[in-house]
Amino acid sequence: MKRLVLACALLALLAGCRETPADHLQRARDAVFEKRPDEALVEYRKAVDLLRRDDTPQSMVLRARALKGAADVYWLEQRKVKEAVSVYKELLAQCPESPEALEARIILAELLRVHYRDLRGAIDQLTAALQRNPPQSAELHYQVAKLYFELGDYAQSELEANRLAERFSTSAYVDDALFLRAQAIHMMEGRRQEASKAYADLRARFPDSELAAHATVEMGRLRAEAGENEKAIELWVEALKSHPDPALVQDYISRARRRIADTTPGAIGERAAAFGHGPPPRPPARAPRTSVEAVGGTAEEASRDHGD
């Protein structure tokens, strides 16, 4: 009887000492807080290993947290991009519908764009994130539009920017989207007039936006490209009032004025010449009459040479 009681007590003790995935998760979080990332990674991996064969809803929740925690340690604490990308992808494969997966897609998109220049991969991740209708959808739409612009797919960039402006008309990203739309149109051949209208639309809808001055500068550039330097200067002078880089705008103005000067015939537009107030014209030089004058002698010396 005593042996049976002892055995039961031992089993109870062993059961109480058994570590759970939640225990490892807590230890991992403590290690992160205490700046011990290597130890945190060990604990996160132990939690994942214990949960690997358990597909219950609670297990999936813990697994997603463990994988997200490990990926964040690789990226945020150790700056190990390759390892972070691998674990974020593991999270997406095992727990695609978890809240952590949404965050992982957004982070993964940035890593793919910045560190691998995989712009299409980044677009895929953001597009998948948008299917979840996250609260930051307007921002993600804008990021997608910018990525298409970086790819040189200006038509798709214009389309994505339009979608943002239509679906999220009260978002803080609408003026950014309209400016990007105008830039995309500007980059497409044969659509200069449409681009100018798009910039003007931004100025009309958001006159107090910091992008309004940038739109004015771009309208001036379009005028200059069309050879309308005077109109370009008018727009640039207007932009000087609020543009964050007035030196850049002044440079545009100076270059346009030089182009005007280089293409204007001499004396045209000069007030003194137009009203006859300039210096009198120089008389034409008299051709030398003798060989003495030809080499620089005076008329008097020439006459003496000939015995005059």
Language-model regions, residue ranges each:
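Acidic, polar-rich low-complexity tracts and alpha-helical solenoid repeat scaffolds
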Residues: 4-6, 16-308
